[in-house]
Protein backbone atom coordinates (compact mmCIF):
# COMPACT_ATOMS: atom_id res chain seq x y z
CA UNK A 1 0.00 0.00 0.00
CA UNK A 2 1.42 3.44 -0.91
CA UNK A 3 2.08 6.06 1.78
CA UNK A 4 -0.65 8.22 0.22
CA UNK A 5 -3.29 5.48 0.41
CA UNK A 6 -2.17 4.47 3.89
CA UNK A 7 -2.51 8.09 5.02
CA UNK A 8 -6.06 8.36 3.72
CA UNK A 9 -7.01 4.98 5.19
CA UNK A 10 -5.77 5.97 8.64
CA UNK A 11 -7.22 9.47 8.28
CA UNK A 12 -10.66 8.08 7.43
CA UNK A 13 -10.68 5.69 10.38
CA UNK A 14 -9.53 8.36 12.84
CA UNK A 15 -12.08 10.89 11.59
CA UNK A 16 -15.00 8.48 11.83
CA UNK A 17 -13.93 7.37 15.31
CA UNK A 18 -13.25 10.86 16.71
CA UNK A 19 -16.49 12.78 16.25
CA UNK A 20 -17.22 15.78 18.46
CA UNK A 21 -20.88 16.20 19.46
CA UNK A 22 -20.38 19.99 19.53
CA UNK A 23 -19.75 19.86 15.79
CA UNK A 24 -23.06 18.11 15.09
CA UNK A 25 -24.46 21.06 13.04
CA UNK A 26 -21.41 20.98 10.75
CA UNK A 27 -21.57 17.21 10.38
CA UNK A 28 -25.26 17.45 9.55
CA UNK A 29 -24.81 20.04 6.80
CA UNK A 30 -22.05 17.92 5.26
CA UNK A 31 -24.30 14.85 5.57
CA UNK A 32 -27.13 16.69 3.76
CA UNK A 33 -24.76 17.64 0.93
CA UNK A 34 -23.11 14.23 0.64
CA UNK A 35 -26.36 12.27 0.48
CA UNK A 36 -28.35 14.97 -1.35
CA UNK A 37 -31.02 15.00 1.32
CA UNK A 38 -34.20 16.92 0.52
CA UNK A 39 -36.60 17.86 3.33
CA UNK A 40 -40.15 19.12 2.82
CA UNK A 41 -39.87 21.97 5.32
CA UNK A 42 -37.55 23.63 7.83
CA UNK A 43 -39.50 21.88 10.55
CA UNK A 44 -38.78 18.50 8.95
CA UNK A 45 -35.11 19.41 8.57
CA UNK A 46 -34.93 20.35 12.25
CA UNK A 47 -36.63 17.10 13.21
CA UNK A 48 -34.14 15.15 11.12
CA UNK A 49 -31.27 17.09 12.67
CA UNK A 50 -32.40 16.09 16.16
CA UNK A 51 -32.51 12.43 15.10
CA UNK A 52 -29.08 12.87 13.48
CA UNK A 53 -27.72 14.37 16.70
CA UNK A 54 -29.08 11.45 18.72
CA UNK A 55 -27.51 8.96 16.29
CA UNK A 56 -24.21 10.84 16.39
CA UNK A 57 -24.14 10.58 20.17
CA UNK A 58 -24.77 6.84 19.83
CA UNK A 59 -21.92 6.56 17.30
CA UNK A 60 -19.54 8.39 19.66
CA UNK A 61 -20.51 6.08 22.54
CA UNK A 62 -20.03 2.96 20.42
CA UNK A 63 -16.64 4.13 19.16
CA UNK A 64 -15.59 4.66 22.76
CA UNK A 65 -16.75 1.25 24.01
CA UNK A 66 -16.61 -1.22 21.11
CA UNK A 67 -13.75 -2.70 19.08
CA UNK A 68 -15.62 -1.91 15.87
CA UNK A 69 -15.71 1.54 14.26
CA UNK A 70 -18.99 3.35 13.57
CA UNK A 71 -19.60 6.39 11.38
CA UNK A 72 -22.17 8.79 9.98
CA UNK A 73 -23.79 7.13 6.97
CA UNK A 74 -26.92 7.16 4.82
CA UNK A 75 -29.10 6.04 7.75
CA UNK A 76 -28.00 8.79 10.13
CA UNK A 77 -31.09 11.02 9.84
CA UNK A 78 -33.45 8.10 10.44
CA UNK A 79 -34.50 6.79 13.82
CA UNK A 80 -33.56 3.22 14.62
CA UNK A 81 -37.18 2.14 14.30
CA UNK A 82 -37.51 3.84 10.89
CA UNK A 83 -34.38 2.17 9.54
CA UNK A 84 -35.42 -1.25 10.78
CA UNK A 85 -38.90 -0.78 9.29
CA UNK A 86 -37.64 0.38 5.87
CA UNK A 87 -34.38 -1.47 5.29
CA UNK A 88 -34.68 -4.93 6.89
CA UNK A 89 -37.73 -7.19 6.49
CA UNK A 90 -37.56 -10.32 8.61
CA UNK A 91 -41.10 -11.01 9.77
CA UNK A 92 -43.68 -13.73 10.15
CA UNK A 93 -45.24 -14.99 6.90
CA UNK A 94 -48.95 -15.50 6.42
CA UNK A 95 -48.51 -19.29 6.47
CA UNK A 96 -45.83 -21.96 6.05
CA UNK A 97 -45.79 -25.26 4.20
CA UNK A 98 -43.04 -26.92 6.30
CA UNK A 99 -41.07 -28.46 3.43
CA UNK A 100 -37.76 -27.96 5.26
CA UNK A 101 -36.42 -30.81 7.36
CA UNK A 102 -35.35 -30.00 10.92
CA UNK A 103 -31.84 -31.28 11.73
CA UNK A 104 -30.68 -31.42 15.37
CA UNK A 105 -26.95 -30.78 15.83
CA UNK A 106 -26.56 -32.08 19.38
CA UNK A 107 -22.90 -33.07 19.40
CA UNK A 108 -20.27 -30.55 20.55
CA UNK A 109 -18.42 -28.88 17.66
CA UNK A 110 -15.36 -30.67 16.32
CA UNK A 111 -12.01 -29.15 15.49
CA UNK A 112 -11.73 -27.34 12.18
CA UNK A 113 -9.61 -24.60 10.61
CA UNK A 114 -9.27 -21.38 12.61
CA UNK A 115 -10.23 -19.33 9.55
CA UNK A 116 -12.52 -19.96 6.60
CA UNK A 117 -13.97 -17.57 4.04
CA UNK A 118 -15.99 -18.54 0.96
CA UNK A 119 -14.95 -15.26 -0.71
CA UNK A 120 -11.44 -16.65 -1.10
CA UNK A 121 -12.85 -19.40 -3.29
CA UNK A 122 -14.83 -16.91 -5.44
CA UNK A 123 -18.15 -18.41 -4.35
CA UNK A 124 -19.82 -15.20 -3.12
CA UNK A 125 -21.65 -12.88 -5.50
CA UNK A 126 -21.38 -9.09 -5.33
CA UNK A 127 -23.10 -7.14 -2.56
CA UNK A 128 -26.55 -5.87 -3.54
CA UNK A 129 -28.76 -3.10 -2.20
CA UNK A 130 -32.34 -3.88 -1.21
CA UNK A 131 -33.20 -0.19 -0.80
CA UNK A 132 -36.40 0.78 0.99
CA UNK A 133 -38.01 -2.63 0.57
CA UNK A 134 -38.23 -5.13 3.43
CA UNK A 135 -36.88 -7.98 1.34
CA UNK A 136 -33.75 -8.95 3.28
CA UNK A 137 -35.19 -12.47 3.47
CA UNK A 138 -35.13 -12.73 -0.35
CA UNK A 139 -31.62 -11.29 -0.66
CA UNK A 140 -30.12 -13.59 1.99
CA UNK A 141 -31.91 -16.67 0.66
CA UNK A 142 -30.91 -16.09 -2.96
CA UNK A 143 -27.35 -15.13 -1.96
CA UNK A 144 -27.02 -18.60 -0.47
CA UNK A 145 -28.40 -20.22 -3.64
CA UNK A 146 -26.04 -18.14 -5.78
CA UNK A 147 -23.17 -19.55 -3.73
CA UNK A 148 -24.54 -23.09 -4.01
CA UNK A 149 -24.64 -22.65 -7.78
CA UNK A 150 -21.06 -21.29 -7.79
CA UNK A 151 -19.85 -24.24 -5.71
CA UNK A 152 -21.55 -26.72 -8.07
CA UNK A 153 -20.75 -25.04 -11.40
CA UNK A 154 -17.75 -22.79 -10.66
CA UNK A 155 -19.66 -19.80 -12.04
CA UNK A 156 -21.25 -16.78 -10.38
CA UNK A 157 -24.80 -15.77 -11.29
CA UNK A 158 -27.21 -13.20 -9.85
CA UNK A 159 -30.69 -14.48 -9.11
CA UNK A 160 -33.91 -12.45 -9.14
CA UNK A 161 -34.99 -11.08 -5.77
CA UNK A 162 -37.86 -9.36 -7.59
CA UNK A 163 -39.29 -12.74 -8.56
CA UNK A 164 -39.30 -13.68 -4.88
CA UNK A 165 -41.01 -10.42 -3.93
CA UNK A 166 -43.68 -10.74 -6.63
CA UNK A 167 -44.29 -14.48 -6.87
CA UNK A 168 -43.61 -15.97 -3.42
CA UNK A 169 -47.10 -16.62 -2.03
CA UNK A 170 -45.73 -17.72 1.34
CA UNK A 171 -43.92 -14.50 2.30
CA UNK A 172 -45.19 -10.94 1.85
CA UNK A 173 -42.82 -9.13 -0.51
CA UNK A 174 -41.45 -5.81 0.69
CA UNK A 175 -43.48 -6.23 3.87
CA UNK A 176 -41.25 -9.09 5.01
CA UNK A 177 -40.66 -12.82 5.11
CA UNK A 178 -38.59 -15.63 6.58
CA UNK A 179 -35.64 -17.65 5.34
CA UNK A 180 -36.98 -21.19 5.44
CA UNK A 181 -40.33 -20.13 3.99
CA UNK A 182 -38.47 -18.51 1.08
CA UNK A 183 -36.82 -21.86 0.36
CA UNK A 184 -40.25 -23.51 0.59
CA UNK A 185 -41.65 -20.97 -1.86
CA UNK A 186 -38.89 -21.74 -4.38
CA UNK A 187 -39.75 -25.44 -4.12
CA UNK A 188 -43.41 -24.56 -4.81
CA UNK A 189 -42.59 -22.20 -7.71
CA UNK A 190 -40.19 -24.68 -9.27
CA UNK A 191 -37.16 -22.42 -9.53
CA UNK A 192 -35.71 -18.91 -9.85
CA UNK A 193 -34.73 -16.78 -12.84
CA UNK A 194 -31.59 -14.67 -13.13
CA UNK A 195 -31.72 -10.99 -12.23
CA UNK A 196 -31.19 -9.81 -15.83
CA UNK A 197 -34.39 -11.57 -16.89
CA UNK A 198 -36.39 -10.29 -13.91
CA UNK A 199 -34.69 -7.06 -12.68
CA UNK A 200 -35.00 -5.63 -9.18
CA UNK A 201 -37.53 -2.82 -8.64
CA UNK A 202 -37.40 -2.37 -4.84
CA UNK A 203 -41.21 -2.54 -4.62
CA UNK A 204 -44.08 -5.01 -4.83
CA UNK A 205 -45.43 -5.84 -8.28
CA UNK A 206 -47.48 -8.54 -9.98
CA UNK A 207 -45.85 -11.89 -10.71
CA UNK A 208 -44.20 -12.14 -14.15
CA UNK A 209 -42.00 -15.21 -13.72
CA UNK A 210 -41.23 -17.40 -16.73
CA UNK A 211 -40.63 -21.06 -15.71
CA UNK A 212 -38.81 -21.68 -19.00
CA UNK A 213 -36.08 -19.33 -17.74
CA UNK A 214 -35.50 -20.92 -14.34
CA UNK A 215 -31.78 -21.53 -13.73
CA UNK A 216 -31.80 -22.77 -10.13
CA UNK A 217 -34.27 -24.88 -8.19
CA UNK A 218 -34.32 -26.17 -4.62
CA UNK A 219 -34.32 -29.93 -4.15
CA UNK A 220 -34.64 -29.83 -0.37
CA UNK A 221 -34.01 -27.50 2.55
CA UNK A 222 -32.87 -28.00 6.12
CA UNK A 223 -33.30 -26.05 9.35
CA UNK A 224 -30.66 -26.60 12.01
CA UNK A 225 -31.22 -26.68 15.78
CA UNK A 226 -28.19 -26.42 18.05
CA UNK A 227 -27.16 -24.95 21.39
CA UNK A 228 -23.61 -24.59 20.09
CA UNK A 229 -22.98 -21.43 18.10
CA UNK A 230 -19.69 -22.92 16.88
CA UNK A 231 -21.60 -25.69 15.08
CA UNK A 232 -22.40 -23.07 12.46
CA UNK A 233 -18.75 -23.42 11.38
CA UNK A 234 -19.30 -27.05 10.42
CA UNK A 235 -22.50 -26.24 8.53
CA UNK A 236 -20.80 -23.31 6.78
CA UNK A 237 -17.84 -25.34 5.56
CA UNK A 238 -19.81 -28.44 4.57
CA UNK A 239 -23.11 -27.00 3.31
CA UNK A 240 -21.98 -23.61 2.01
CA UNK A 241 -22.82 -20.01 2.99
CA UNK A 242 -25.76 -19.82 5.40
CA UNK A 243 -28.59 -17.27 5.50
CA UNK A 244 -29.07 -16.28 9.14
CA UNK A 245 -31.44 -14.05 11.12
CA UNK A 246 -30.08 -11.25 13.32
CA UNK A 247 -31.08 -8.18 15.30
CA UNK A 248 -29.76 -5.33 13.13
CA UNK A 249 -30.43 -2.56 15.66
CA UNK A 250 -26.76 -2.05 16.54
CA UNK A 251 -25.15 -2.40 13.11
CA UNK A 252 -26.84 0.51 11.32
CA UNK A 253 -23.86 2.90 11.52
CA UNK A 254 -21.16 0.23 11.33
CA UNK A 255 -18.01 0.98 9.31
CA UNK A 256 -15.42 -1.70 10.09
CA UNK A 257 -13.94 -4.04 12.69
CA UNK A 258 -15.39 -6.73 14.95
CA UNK A 259 -18.67 -5.88 16.66
CA UNK A 260 -18.48 -7.08 20.26
CA UNK A 261 -21.63 -5.48 21.66
CA UNK A 262 -24.71 -6.11 19.57
CA UNK A 263 -28.34 -6.09 20.71
CA UNK A 264 -30.24 -9.35 20.94
CA UNK A 265 -33.73 -8.00 21.53
CA UNK A 266 -35.60 -9.40 18.53
CA UNK A 267 -34.69 -10.73 15.12
CA UNK A 268 -35.51 -8.30 12.31
CA UNK A 269 -32.96 -8.76 9.51
CA UNK A 270 -31.51 -11.55 7.34
CA UNK A 271 -27.91 -11.70 6.12
CA UNK A 272 -25.52 -14.31 4.71
CA UNK A 273 -22.85 -16.00 6.83
CA UNK A 274 -19.82 -16.41 4.54
CA UNK A 275 -16.88 -17.10 6.82
CA UNK A 276 -15.11 -16.77 10.14
CA UNK A 277 -11.70 -15.88 11.54
CA UNK A 278 -9.68 -14.70 14.54
CA UNK A 279 -8.16 -11.27 15.12
CA UNK A 280 -6.21 -10.33 18.26
CA UNK A 281 -7.49 -13.55 19.87
CA UNK A 282 -11.10 -12.52 19.18
CA UNK A 283 -13.01 -15.06 17.04
CA UNK A 284 -15.52 -13.53 14.64
CA UNK A 285 -18.12 -14.29 11.98
CA UNK A 286 -18.05 -12.66 8.52
CA UNK A 287 -21.45 -11.71 7.12
CA UNK A 288 -22.70 -10.28 3.84
CA UNK A 289 -25.38 -7.59 4.08
CA UNK A 290 -27.75 -6.20 1.42
CA UNK A 291 -27.32 -2.46 2.07
CA UNK A 292 -24.88 -1.75 -0.76
CA UNK A 293 -21.09 -1.49 -0.85
CA UNK A 294 -21.12 1.99 0.70
CA UNK A 295 -22.08 0.41 4.04
CA UNK A 296 -19.66 -1.44 6.32
CA UNK A 297 -16.60 -3.18 4.91
CA UNK A 298 -17.67 -2.96 1.26
CA UNK A 299 -21.04 -4.40 2.28
CA UNK A 300 -19.72 -7.01 4.74
CA UNK A 301 -19.39 -6.94 8.53
CA UNK A 302 -17.91 -8.93 11.41
CA UNK A 303 -19.40 -9.88 14.77
CA UNK A 304 -17.79 -11.66 17.70
CA UNK A 305 -18.37 -15.41 17.96
CA UNK A 306 -19.76 -17.39 20.88
CA UNK A 307 -21.56 -14.51 22.61
CA UNK A 308 -24.72 -14.76 20.48
CA UNK A 309 -23.95 -11.31 19.07
CA UNK A 310 -26.99 -9.82 17.29
CA UNK A 311 -28.90 -12.99 18.23
CA UNK A 312 -27.20 -15.00 15.48
CA UNK A 313 -28.13 -18.35 17.02
CA UNK A 314 -31.64 -17.46 18.17
CA UNK A 315 -33.32 -18.64 14.97
CA UNK A 316 -32.81 -21.95 13.20
CA UNK A 317 -30.19 -21.60 10.46
CA UNK A 318 -31.49 -22.69 7.05
CA UNK A 319 -29.71 -24.19 4.05
CA UNK A 320 -30.89 -25.64 0.75
CA UNK A 321 -29.66 -28.16 -1.79
CA UNK A 322 -30.10 -27.00 -5.38
CA UNK A 323 -31.06 -29.04 -8.43
UniProtKB/Swiss-Prot annotation:
Pfam family, one: Peptidase_C1
Keywords: Disulfide bond, Glycoprotein, Hydrolase, Protease, Signal, Thiol protease, Zymogen
Reactions the enzyme catalyzes: Endopeptidase of broad specificity, hydrolyzing substrates of both cathepsin L and cathepsin B
CDD domains documented for this protein: Peptidase_C1A
Job of this protein: Cysteine protease that plays an essential role in host liquefaction to facilitate horizontal transmission of the virus. May participate in the degradation of foreign protein expressed by the baculovirus system.
Propeptide stretches in the record: 19-112
Signal peptide coordinates: 1-18
Residues the record marks as carrying a glycan: 158
Disulfide feature: 133-174, 167-207, 262-310
UniProt GO molecular function: cysteine-type peptidase activity
Modification after translation: Synthesized as an inactive proenzyme and activated by proteolytic removal of the inhibitory propeptide.
Active site: 136, 269, 289
EC number: 3.4.22.50
Enzyme class: hydrolase
UniProt KW Cell division keyword: no
Gene: VCATH
SMART domains: Inhibitor_I29, Pept_C1
Protein name per UniProt: Viral cathepsin
Protein species of origin: Epiphyas postvittana nucleopolyhedrovirus
PANTHER family: CYSTEINE PROTEASE FAMILY C1-RELATED
InterPro entries: Papain-like_cys_pep_sf (IPR038765), Pept_asp_AS (IPR025661), Pept_cys_AS (IPR000169), Pept_his_AS (IPR025660), Peptidase_C1A (IPR013128), Peptidase_C1A_C (IPR000668), Peptidase_C1A_papain-like (IPR039417), Prot_inhib_I29 (IPR013201)
Repeat recorded as keyword: no
Family of this protein: Belongs to the peptidase C1 family.
A GO biological process held by the record: proteolysis
Amino acid sequence: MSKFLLYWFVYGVVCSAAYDILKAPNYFEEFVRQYNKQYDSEYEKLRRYKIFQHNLNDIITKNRNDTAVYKINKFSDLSKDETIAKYTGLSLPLHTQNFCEVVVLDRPPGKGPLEFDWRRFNKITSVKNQGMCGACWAFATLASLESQFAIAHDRLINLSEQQMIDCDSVDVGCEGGLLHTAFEAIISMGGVQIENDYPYESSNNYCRMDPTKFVVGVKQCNRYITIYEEKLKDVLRLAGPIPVAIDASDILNYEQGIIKYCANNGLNHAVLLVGYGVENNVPYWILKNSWGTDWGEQGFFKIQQNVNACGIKNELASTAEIN
